[in-house]
Design a protein with these regions (language model features):
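Fe(II)/2-oxoglutarate oxygenase catalytic core
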Residues: 1-187
Length: 187
């Protein structure tokens, strides 16, 4: 029998969560996936994901990435430089981040692993069950697609306070599908 990679839970109280979103502009959906699919998705991310690195050091700098599929000469020195730059920006109180990432949409569009599990994940995120859930929760009936990026926070990684408002790019709503195990602590 095939493993479930992405299956929504039957226990989501859509009406209550939609009311909360309407009141606050944000909502947390606990246990949005079935336990089996959450375990399988967590395993995919932990064992079959070639993580790159995304960084930003202050508002004036561009986001820099080290892609897992696009290694470049000098990446080791670049890594040291961007670690120092993100440290300095964070110390100054500027917007900064440093985390591991896998650009699911870019990987899909560029054919990194045609038909592989990350492609299938993106298809599930954009399939009717998930899109209908997001439309119902947000009241945004015109939503047609979702972007996707996997993000991993390892020791030394961080994300500064920020806004996910990307209206100029056509975004209507941002989402986070948190795959962290229960023992996680914010520090």
């Amino acid at each position: 029998m095939a493993q479930q990679l992405f299956a929504l839970s039957d226990d989501i109280d859509i009406a209550a969560l939609a009311r909360r979103f309407a009141q606050t502009g944000r909502v947390q959906v606990p246990d949005v996936l079935t336990q089996e699919s959450a375990r399988n998705l967590r395993a995919l991310l932990a064992t079959k994901t070639e993580w790159g690195l995304a960084t930003k050091a202050g508002e004036e700098t561009a986001i820099q990435t080290l892609h897992p599929k696009r290694p470049q000469p000098g990446d080791r020195q670049k890594l040291a430089d961007i670690y120092a730059a993100t440290e300095d920006a964070a110390k100054r109180g500027d917007y900064a981040f440093r985390y591991a990432f896998y650009p699911i949409l870019d990987a899909f569009n560029e054919g990194w692993d045609r038909g592989g599990p990350h492609d299938i994940l993106l298809e599930h995120i954009n399939a009717d069950p998930m899109m209908e859930l997001v439309r119902a929760l947000t009241g945004f009936s015109g939503l047609t697609k979702a972007d996707a990026q996997a993000t991993l926070y390892a020791p030394g990684h961080f994300l500064g306070v920020h806004s996910d408002s990307h209206v100029e790019e056509g975004w209507r709503v941002a989402y986070v599908l948190n795959m962290t195990v229960d023992e996680w602590r914010p520090e």
